[in-house]
Amino acid sequence: MTEELITPVYCTGVSAQVQKKRDKELGLGRHENAIKYLGQDYETLRARCLQSGVLFQDEAFPPVSHSLGFKELGPHSSKTYGIKWKRPTELMSNPQFIVDGATRTDICQGALGDCWLLAAIASLTLNETILHRVVPYGQSFQDGYAGIFHFQLWQFGEWVDVVIDDLLPTKDGKLVFVHSAQGNEFWSALLEKAYAKVNGSYEALSGGCTSEAFEDFTGGVTEWYDLQKAPSDLYQIILKALERGSLLGCSINISDIRDLEAITFKNLVRGHAYSVTGAKQVTYQGQRVNLIRMRNPWGEVEWKGPWSDSSYEWNKVDPYEREQLRVKMEDGEFWMSFRDFIREFTKLEICNLTPDALKSRTLRNWNTTFYEGTWRRGSTAGGCRNYPATFWVNPQFKIRLEEVDDADDYDNRESGCSFLLALMQKHRRRERRFGRDMETIGFAVYQVPRELAGQPVHLKRDFFLANASRAQSEHFINLREVSNRIRLPPGEYIVVPSTFEPNKEGDFLLRFFSEKKAGTQELDDQIQANLPDEKVLSEEEIDDNFKTLFSKLAGDDMEISVKELQTILNRIISKHKDLRTNGFSLESCRSMVNLMDRDGNGKLGLVEFNILWNRIRNYLTIFRKFDLDKSGSMSAYEMRMAIEAAGFKLNKKLHELIITRYSEPDLAVDFDNFVCCLVRLETMFRFFKLLDTDLDGVVTFDLFKWLQLTMFA
């Protein structure tokens, strides 16, 4: 029985987040049920084009200047002058999608600085199964050609099916960007276009890490090795990785931008991404030598040292072995000794597809879990541990380590539980055209003390002030992803992902990979309210001085209207020079009246005004307590603590909404907004409590009650 396909429903705002969660629970976003990117269905669009006889043109990524770029490749750039978008059928009489299978030589770099992407595409060709997860079968310029193609990419936890037309940027009749060595093969150029589409433009692909594309082609996770500190078994790690279909890339770091793509005297390119495509041991002068094979996406400029294409070392290798390993001259691919590799290159990236435990001698899969989260100014963007006043507001995740690694995994080291953490920031390439780029990100890991074990609560500031981290990312760095392999004793741990500085916004994906069974969960406070006692005083119980005050403030009807309440509160608050405030608005005063008005006449009598008066005095005490710097206003982070002190426990999303609604542009919250927020919260909680007659935390109401609640709360 075939699995039923889930069709996505397209929503906006908060409803979109709810719908997305439901879609995931139903399996949408798995590779076998990829999401139709931007709602475009390949089969439907292709059938429509074939029926109409019109070749497909993609309105979502049109053949215009802004699809090329925004600055270096922008509309008025000299680099885009003379570019024309043409289909392969316009460039030659017999274009091919793939000729005799996809190979590494199908990928030659053009005028775009996306060698990191092309190195990953070259590695992709080493594993046909993985290749055709990205490049679906059945595409051609002959049978059923309609000018439309599609590719499947992993994007931040879900697979998407990306539709493109085959209009490609050309200049003087030749492809401007990636092309095949043969010139008549177009799968790599079309894949590059699909990748440009999901990232917003071709220019957005300029500069990056090979691991980024590795992960988008596989959904795997990448580990980095500093070759200046290479582990003793790195060659075995590389052999295992290649055997298991992992994707590998390497590069030479630069310290000066002027060295970018500078060529060394042995013909290696600095700051340039290479694919690692093979590793082999050969017998040379009676000794076994470890070799490693690499490819330059340029399709030329090869290593000129030992074991290069024309080096004398090959003459002393067994002829059969030599023929098995020798590569063509100037095709961009070459061999070098592993010793030279360690000396010449500085960074190795391995994308583990499962991921497998590459450092273990036994083959096994890891348990994987991922969470999506956000950093929002004023609510969940607290910065790193250098900012103790706000660090605690970052999202928090718990991992429970239960089983230690097998004995042969840790040799003579202390036993522990291994896991890999990978923190990825989302959509940053798309945002480059708006002047935004990668934030500096990282994470810290804390052990949960025994007294807090098993409690799914968001840990507060005092905990982080009193406890040091047990592990952390090696660096805070402005890459799309940071990852670390960590080993800790069994127990519960809190992972805190963050940007380096506070108030840096972004969306992120946090992935856990554990070798043994491990439980994970996102920590958040449960929504609850400790509402003030609703005991109603009689007029006789109210202080005589307050009665005298009320009689002076109220009108002839001895009740206070919304307008009168506004006048009273603003007159009082203006006397408190230490408070930063714009005064109470008519709307906020109306909310207060709605909360306190027991008889429904839209005004406050003596008893009602007495309750409100005492409530505001209490709010003022709380406000002053949490205005830590005595600035007359609270910061958004102080507001979070003040709300809890007032009796309300809210989750991250609600804090986010409150800061959006009640803070000023500088994230300050003044007294009148603080009061309005607490009044609104109390009103909403009381409404819910009134409707929740069976106390199960769920209420059902009709449209009238919904409108009544939202219009007048």
Curated annotation (Swiss-Prot):
Describe activity control: Activated by micromolar concentrations of calcium and inhibited by calpastatin.
Where does this protein reside within or beyond the cell?
A: Cytoplasm; Cell membrane
Q: Locate the region Domain III.
A: 355-525
Q: Which residues carry this modification: Phosphothreonine?
A: T354
Post-translational modification note: Undergoes calcium-induced successive autoproteolytic cleavages that generate a membrane-bound 78 kDa active form and an intracellular 75 kDa active form. Calpastatin reduces with high efficiency the transition from 78 kDa to 75 kDa calpain forms.
Renumbered residue ranges of the record's region Linker = 526-541
Q: What is this protein called?
A: Calpain-1 catalytic subunit
